[in-house]
Amino acid sequence: IVSLHEGNTPLIRFYNLEKYLGANFSIYGKFEGLNPTGSFKDRGMTMAVSKALENKNIDSVICASTGNTSASAAAYAARANLKCFVIIPDGQIAFGKLAQAIAYGAKIIQINGNFDDGMSIIKNIADEQSNVCVVNSLNPFRIQGQKTISYEIFDQLGKMPDYHFLPVGNAGNINAHWIGYKEISGHSFNHCNLCSGNCEYMSSIKHAELPVIIGYQAIGAAPLATGKTFN
């Protein structure tokens, strides 16, 4: 397993926000910034890179990125002694994250195009080169790693949240959360290998109700929220 000790981030109660809103309910935030490269992407990257290592033909990972994915991919590739290639849109990347990717030894390729153009390029490369693994969220193992947030929230609260709000880009992370909650609630859960599903903990999981998940997007880039195309 290729790990940088990701996960187990704190769930922090926002007492001041509750007071400001006059809320008669509890508000919590999951501090994913405490992951190794500063984002939830590390949860998925440990899975994606670990699975890539299982294929002896793969010696490189590749991603298109405007920020967090580039830093995470570069860090985990370095840990696994794999080469990392990052495709970035022209002038459209968070420089702090780009600096991380460079520091971890990734090869950076800037294109005259947007993120979607970059995604098309990396998919074509991976289709043509059997030694290259795509580690963007279209990689299903990324989603499997990121769903662990839901499990942690359930453990830390001791129950399901009633509502879960989170930002949405291409919807990979909100999908991962939903998969996690569905597994916890028993909608797609098989059984515990240790107790065959008979312990008190497993019983509480199987009867947990699904939360309402609400995604939100920045006003300048909200294609899912508005149904409009943004360049």
Regions found by a protein language model. Give the residues of each.
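PLP-dependent amino-acid enzyme catalytic core
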Residues: 1-231
